[in-house]
Regions:
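A common structural junction motif
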Residues: 238-239, 326-337, 388-394
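Conserved small-domain helix->loop->beta segment predominantly found in fold-type I
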Residues: 269-337, 354-360
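Short, well-ordered beta-strand elements within core beta-sheets of diverse protein domains
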Residues: 250-259, 307-314, 370-374
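Conserved PLP-enzyme active-site core in the AAT-like
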Residues: 2, 8-17, 78-280, 285, ...
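N-terminal "arm"/small-domain region of PLP-dependent enzymes with the aminotransferase-like
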Residues: 2-60, 68
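Conserved N-terminal alpha-helix of the aminotransferase class I/II PLP-enzyme fold
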Residues: 38-87, 112-119
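C-terminal core of ALDH-fold dehydrogenases
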Residues: 10-29, 318-358
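PLP-dependent enzyme catalytic core of the Aspartate aminotransferase-like
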Residues: 118, 127-129, 145, 325, ...
């Protein structure tokens, strides 16, 4: 298989494993276990002396195809597909830590990710320090002799802050810590954390990789040594494996990832520019705009903008609700990366469990709204916003 294939080709052909029947579409191997020709063959398989599958909780041919395709796209040596994005995040963090270890995490995280490092990890004796990840000095100040993991997402959910991944990786390497990056918002098409120095990348495949709101899934990607030493046993014994059916569904979704993301990004950029000109909008945050606070870092580490737009309405929560309720094409939903345009009010949905103070620190105000642009006609989406804004009180 050619390593020179470009992403669009990798996503259609990468990792394909055909049976003796020569099917054009990847097969779904819906089986719990696998048969061995002899007892000796079973023994050798379990000893690791021969390659092959043992049990679907450990891996399956369908999952293997999906993992290999993700590795090609990300530039990773190895990967494990998980039942959800949160299963991937939890596995990537907990599999390499023990009681007494310390995590430094950017405070701007998806609500459930923040719960894992701030609430779950301490139950196992793992300390966590949350920082404003935009300033590299904060990462350095938070380091202790027990620091083993740096965790961040970039761009962040929902306010699209950007963190200097290469800078964080440099600090981590100085102390032998690992950098885990949640790359969901950038997608592997616009940002490759491993090339920037990160050690582990996680995705919620539920989002852009599926792209059509059908199934849950996640992926952890890293070098083979790290996977073997940290994730292998955790994966076998705790059971976060993706189902073969979901792996097959994601194989179908990922084929069109470049086409969808291209249209979604074009829509997001044009909608961001439109919203920036509206009097009822206090501010717009979009990684493709020159007025983004971290535009210099974006130019250095990202090759494209985003399918997401964050904006703040002057009228606060009432204005946000009025806008969302008046939209016709764009649907209210907390999901993202879908072919359909989706909108949500983070303060009352994805980040509702944070205190008012914590939300304010993240830049989430009562008027903050997050748009996940879909693949619809751009003009229809802008007209939908124009109509809805007309129903928002000044």
């Amino acid at each position: 298989m050619s390593k020179t294939w470009r992403p669009a080709t990798q996503l259609v052909h990468g990792g394909t494993l055909r049976s003796q029947y020569g099917e054009t579409s990847e097969a779904i191997y819906l089986t719990q276990g696998f048969v061995y020709e002899t007892s000796e063959a079973a023994e050798a398989r379990f000893k690791g002396e021969t390659e092959g599958f043992i049990y679907a909780r450990y891996g399956s041919p369908t999952n293997d195809m999906f993992e290999k395709r993700m590795c090609m796209l990300e530039g990773a040596e190895d990967a494990r597909a998980t039942a959800s994005g949160m299963a991937a995040v939890t596995a990537a963090i907990l599999c390499q830590l023990k009681s007494g270890d310390h995590i430094v995490a950017a405070r701007a995280l998806f609500g459930s990710c923040r719960w894992v490092v701030e609430t779950l990890a301490p139950k196992y004796g793992i300390d966590c320090t949350l920082i404003d990840g935009r300033d590299l000095a904060n990462w350095e100040k938070a380091i202790t002799p027990k620091t083993k993991v740096f965790f961040l997402e970039s761009p962040t959910n929902p306010t699209l802050e950007v963190i200097d991944i290469a800078g964080v990786a440099k600090l981590a390497n100085q102390i032998g810590a690992k950098v885990v990056v949640d790359n969901v918002f950038a997608t592997p098409l616009f940002q490759k954390p491993l090339e920037l120095g990160a050690h582990i990348v996680v995705y919620s495949a539920t989002k852009h990789i599926d792209g059509q709101g059908r199934c849950l899934g996640g992926v952890v990607l890293s070098d083979k040594e790290w996977i073997d030493e940290n994730l292998h046993d955790y994966f076998r014994h705790t059971g976060p494996a993706m189902s073969p059916f979901n792996a097959w569904t994601l194989l179908k979704g990922i084929e069109t990832l470049p086409l969808r993301v291209r249209q979604q990004t074009e829509n997001a950029a044009k909608i961001a520019d439109f919203l920036a000109e509206q009097g009822k909008v206090a501010k717009v945050i979009y990684p493709g705009r020159k007025d983004h606070p971290q535009a210099d870092i974006i130019a250095k580490q990202m090759t494209g903008g985003s399918t997401l737009v964050a904006f703040e309405l002057k009228g606060g929560k009432d204005a946000a609700f009025a806008l969302q309720n008046a939209l016709e094409i764009i649907k209210i939903s907390n999901n993202l990366g879908d072919s359909k345009s989706l909108i949500t009010h983070p303060a009352t949905t994805t980040h509702k469990n944070l205190t008012d103070e914590a939300r304010a620190e993240l830049g989430i105000s009562p008027g903050t709204v997050r748009l996940s642009a879909g693949i619809e006609d751009t003009d229809d989406l802008i007209e939908d916003f124009a109509r809805a804004l007309g129903k928002v009180s000044a």
